[in-house]
């Protein structure tokens, strides 16, 4: 399993292997996903009271709100993937 960690702002970190999507929160379907996750108790607000700029969806159904841009999160995700040494088989 992928054990690399991605910083999503303000000292909050998620496991890279669990991330399915990193999206912007403006569209109605994403707002609905956030609302549904809040009702299910699977919403993690990592914005520290700031404006939500990225929504991270995990394979466990959790929805994580971040105050940094989706592009920034994606770049950190790609850097962690490329910069890490290959695991032996």
From Swiss-Prot:
Residue ranges the record marks as coiled coil: none
Matching InterPro entries: RemA-like
Domain of life: Bacteria
Pfam name, any one: RemA-like
Annotated HAMAP family: RemA
NCBIfam families xrefs: MtxBflmRegRemA (NF046064), PRK04323.1 (NF003315)
Family as reported in the entry's similarity comment: Belongs to the RemA family.
Name of the protein this chain belongs to: Putative regulatory protein CYA_2696
